[in-house]
């Protein structure tokens, strides 16, 4: 495994007001004189210099006239400052969420390519938190718990008492990602019933025969099929759920793909 470190991101950022102050000092102006030239109060200029108030379009126009740099320059400076500020604030939040990683199968997610492979050391953990947020598509661990903890789905588990919520949620999300890449017609109940009858006739066939035919039959009936390798500690054989009112998903973990257990799980979920 190639071990990467998190990308460099400085933990400091200068407010655009620093540039305003530098240009004013080059001209030998005090903050009071600068305020007078810009038509602002000294308090407002002090807040602008210290990053307490943003450079608005109006302020950028005034700075262009008084200090010479273009309005676009000042607005871009402000936008970059706000972006870096937001990134630093997010990093601080991520530091508070590091314990969330203990609930997730981070190693398995890295191995599967779901999140980037980096060394799972203290300095990289905030970045891993961000990768996991993006993978699950949630704003914070609280939303993750609310979404995946409250999902009303019918699980078939091999060991209920040993199942891990973090591992199950990761497996479910991997299935969602597979489904997101699939398209097809809306769900057709009659076609699905017909598909199940034909699929029952495939149970004695090897995977290379039954799998493509099975996918085609389900696709034509508007049913998505996701075969997702099992994740340790999830102990989930299969799950059936609706991703939307017209998009049902059957997700199987490939436990016993070549024996009766695979088919038992499929027909249980179907």
Residue ranges and their predicted role:
Residues 21, 32, 61:
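Residues within the helices of the helix-turn-helix
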Residues 24, 49, 59-60, 67, ...:
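DNA major-groove recognition helix of helix-turn-helix
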Residues 32, 43, 72:
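Key DNA-contact positions within bacterial/archaeal DNA-binding proteins
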Residues 2-29:
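A short, Lys/Arg-rich alpha-helix, primarily the initiator
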Residues 3-6, 149-270:
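Conserved binding/catalytic microenvironments
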